[in-house]
Amino acid sequence: MSSDYQLLDFGDHEKIEMFGGTVVRRETPSAIGELGLPRQESELSFRLGRHLSQGKASSEGKSSHGKGSWTGQASATWRTKICDLTFSLRQTPTGQVGVFPEQAHNWNWIAELPDRMQGMKALNLFAYTGGTTMALAGKGVEVVHVDAAKSVVSWARENASLSGFADAPIRWIVEDVMLSLIHI
């Protein structure tokens, strides 16, 4: 599976990642321990090329617990490929960029499932920007994609289009998951 994501380092409640040539340093409360790279190397890897910083590592020097401003030199949006799925990424106020790369193992697992999934149906709740939806669509599964945020569902549709699933049998629902379960 093709991927241009790389986890460069994590610790001190932050992680440093590369998404499609853009290095992102962002606050991550679960990244405990110390950064694996010496601080100088970590700073150097961050300074190379396009980069973004959020929260703790921001130029304001204060921790924002995931709700900070972004600083750095990068496009407002950029793309990355994980498991042959293309994601449009952008900076959000919550410190997210539009993909959870740790889900790649699940997407690979789906891709390796037998082709007899063709025509099956799946319900993807809290579906965010569509990684699992696209992985299932790639196996010919009819997917109901549910998320409460209209902007996130639009973002997922954009990702599906970028990944070649614009015409896949995906039903896009903007609704609170609990309400959606009552209606489905």
Where do the language-model regions lie?
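Conserved SAM/SAH cofactor-binding pocket of Class I
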Residues: 111-178
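Non-catalytic substrate-recognition/targeting regions of SAM-dependent transferases
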Residues: 3-17, 24-101, 108
